[in-house]
């Protein structure tokens, strides 16, 4: 039986190789590449479900009192020296520089108040709302003046609004010891770092304590839903295994009370069953997160030229990933990423294995996000080292690829917004294994073509959408026009280009229900029997929003 499988595998090899050279492949029979397309759809859905980050100031404190203005006049004296209380936020050299503008001059009470105002201006510029400079009662004997610096000390810290998130988890990242001077800039940095690296969001509120010079810190917590469930039906499946499919997405937040996330994504069509389970958990106080995932799929070819050959396949992948933020502020997030994946893929013709492969993939990369109130841009390049094994013929290949993804969104006037998404792969080797090819065509890449219309060793695609929020006319309606483009590169032909344009909409008449549709028009013919347009639609239901 093993010899028969080998003979049949060699017999089919010329067909698949010829198709690969032509870059007009027959309907996909590789479960690995079908799994990658499903993974794209999962990633796109998870991107849409990302919890919005908190806008506005991370720390809110009482308004600083207006500077006291005292009319000039009255007794004047020669200011010989100014002394200050110790400060945690202003260096002695900076204080001396302020005082130098006044020392050695004739001055009155109004001039002294100007000196105090200069110090308070420094506090204000540095966001230190819990500190104040004052001029205490004194005689100014010998031209010596003392300026009192009161820098608020933390009296107590409270946490409110956390239902599924542990108080200890929050204070581990935003923790300031009581009875010490409250470092407001550090508090702001800690809150921003936490918010940019967690779904849970914090707003720090500063309030006067029971005595002058004491400050209470209240951490107001905003949490995502504990459970998120989406059930959907669409025609975005792979044509060879059935375009009509149903699926669900489930997310459980805060299982351990530490912003951990358990997710499941599954789809089912006539010839395809695929599921992905993942768990992601923070492992340090600086936003580092460790994730594990398992994906398994089974296919049966129900359409296309291989339908009569009883083609089936299966694939699975286990992966571990780690992300560690390196630099975080209100406008930037730079994160190092690492991952390891082990995958297995097998294709059978009439229950005889014709391909059976496994791979080990090591990935290292970086993601950079720049964001503001009206825009967000993310670029995430990565380097991959892959060891691929052919378990039937016994071959081993080692090769490297450079991959990446990018997305951007910009709010425009008149209820308009612009979004861009893209991905790429570059491989130095040629004729990569089928489950490592870069494919384009379909609802997540170039919408004017069927899924996996073309594939190659290297490639790219991008989507550009101009949206118009029509909610003022019809509640929950968003319309857009789009332009998609992509290319794949291999040996023959060296390049296959796909371009399309079209229109789409998303309509949520009520919060639990969303209808999505798009029509893409291809700009050129690249596959046989190519349709004049591609329609993709989806209906999504969120039952938990009814509760």
What are these regions (language model features)?
Residues 229-231, 260-264, 288-292, 320, ...:
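Transmembrane beta-strands of outer-membrane beta-barrel proteins
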Residues 294-318, 324-325, 329, 343-349, ...:
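Outer-membrane beta-barrel translocator/channel fold
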Residues 23-237, 265-274, 400-402, 422:
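Periplasmic polypeptide-binding modules associated with outer-membrane biogenesis and secretion
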Residues 250, 505-507, 512, 531-547:
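Outer-membrane beta-barrel "beta-signal"
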Residues 227-237, 248-252, 258-270, 275-277, ...:
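Transmembrane beta-strand segments that form the barrel wall of outer-membrane beta-barrel proteins
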Residues 213, 242-246, 271-275, 314-318, ...:
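Residues that define the transmembrane beta-barrel architecture of outer-membrane proteins
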